[in-house]
Each structure stands twice: as C-alpha cells, then as structure tokens.
Amino acid sequence: MRLFIMAMLVIPSTALAGWSLYEIFLPNGLTNLEIAQLGLGLTLFAWLCMAFWTGIIGFFLQLFNIDPLSLRRIQAQPDSATPLGQKHAVVMPVYNEDTRRIMVGFEACIRELMDSDNSAQFDFYMLSDTRDMAKADAELRAFTRLKKRLGGYSSQVFYRRREKNLHRKVGNLKEFCERWGANYESMIVLDADSVMTGERMQDLARRIEQNPDTALVQTIPMPVRQNTFFGRFVQFAAHLYSPMLATGLSFWQTDSANYWGHNAIIRIAPFMQHCGLPTLEGRAPFGGEILSHDFVEAALLRRAGWQAYLLTDTTGSYEEVPSNIVDYAIRDRRWVQ
C-alpha cells in the first residue's frame, strides 16, 4: 500500500515535469536530440520527485513525532536492560588508507566499548587489502602499538592482511566470513573513515538478537570533522535534511531497506548463505564485478525472506566525507567501469 501511495505521488509529478519540458521543445518541432533529452529528463525528474516526496513524508512524520514503520507516536526500541547473549564482530575493511586516520578511528570505536557491560560480546577486526607495502608495514606497526595500549582487551582485537585482494571489498568480507563468521551472530561493518559510539553498536546488536527475522539494520552515518567551506556545507546539509529523508525512506521501504555498504549491522549466517555475488558475463560496464554490491546484497537478503530496516535515529553513527568537489568526483569514479 505504501509503495502504491509513493507511486501515485511520484508518477503524476514526473509526468507534469516531463510535459512542461515537452512544451518547451514543441514549438519548433522535436529533433532526435531533443527526444533524447526528453527521455533523460523524465528519468531525472522521476529521481528528483521520489526524493522530494520522500522528504515531504519524512517532514510531516517528524513534525508529528510519528514512527515511520508502525505509524504510532511511540517508536519501538530494543530492550536495553537485557544483556547481549551472542558474540558480534566489528569489522573495518581498509585499502591503501592513511594509517594514522584509520587507527585513530578504529581505536576510538574499541574504547567506546571497552568499559561497557557488553564489552566481552564484541571482537574487532581490521581487514586490510592494502597493496602499498610501505603502508602495509605502517599498518602492522601501528596495530602492534595499539595492542600494547589496549592491555588485556587486546585479545579481542585482530588485524588481517590478504596477500591477494581478490574481488575487492566483497572478497575481503567474504574471506572474513569464511574464516571467522561461524564464531559470530552478526558483524558491524565500518568504513575506513567511519566512527560509531559504543551505545549505537550495542543498540544494533540488541536489534539483531531481539528480532530473529531481521538480517540487516542500516544506520544513517552523519558527516563530521569537516573544516573546508565545501565540507562544512555538505555536513550542514546532511544534518539538516538526513532525518527527514531517512524517515521518509523508512516509511515506504518498511522492512525492505537498502544497504549502504558501511555503518550497518548484518546477520552473518544469511549473509553467507544468500549474498554470494557472481562475476557478470560480458564486457564492462555490463559485465565484470558488481561494483554497487551493497544494493544487491540487501535485495538478496530480502528475496530470501529476511527483513532489512533503515534506522532513522541519526545519533551515534558518523563518517567523514571528501572536503572538496574534486575528491568527491574521485570517490564517485569508484563505481564507474
């Protein structure tokens, strides 16, 4: 029903925008180029209209303090009084990153949980695919120093570097799951520039343990630590509209939310069972490795009958974003074949 409502909002809006563009082209007749422009325009209008109505729905749900899933005033929360009963892994895949930055973020997450009542239920893994030998050596030295600083808790912190980084990040996580996944109920996946509070990590683990039909909970990672005008502007914009968009997305996605590749918790057993990705036949861009693997993995979990949710509470989950438009373009090229 919610998807139908969303479609009834998006389709007429897109049609109206497309008709307006058509009327601009019409007086002098339509050329082949203008027909192509009209087709591309309709595609972009649909995308924009979907974001617009998602934001509008989220705005009113937040305005009246209504939970986007239950549509009630009180949002369901996991029972925080019950201690965690399963083991969970916090994994950070890295590839040729700035060693100091990743170690600072990694240690911050560890220390967030060290003194908690559930500290024994979490293990931490830095999963390195670094090819630059100088950076790989720096990672190992920094990790050795980290273990010394952590004292007794260091027995729950691990570093692994693959000799061959087959299948990029997908292969990195796959190897972790095959080697150690059976020891854990779930894994919290962080990016190299991610940070998560101890309370948020415990909250995610509770949601997995207390909802046996749920395989994925995606948080909203909020941008932090920006000091350029561009970076601060992006950070401000995200803090302004992310709560509305997240609430709107949760309203119409319900238990079929997307996976963004990081700052999320995944139940390991169904992930291993259903989310093996093939190498597509043919030449790029339609063949080869699936680059936006996270979207596909969420769809595979949902197809197998597992639930996936977007957590609309934006506290406790953070990431860094590129500080200028050039770095943004470089990052976006990762998904271009």
Description of each model-found segment:
Residues 1-82:
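N-terminal membrane-anchoring/stem segments of glycan-assembly enzymes
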Residues 53-56, 60-337:
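Internal catalytic domains of large membrane-associated glycosyltransferases
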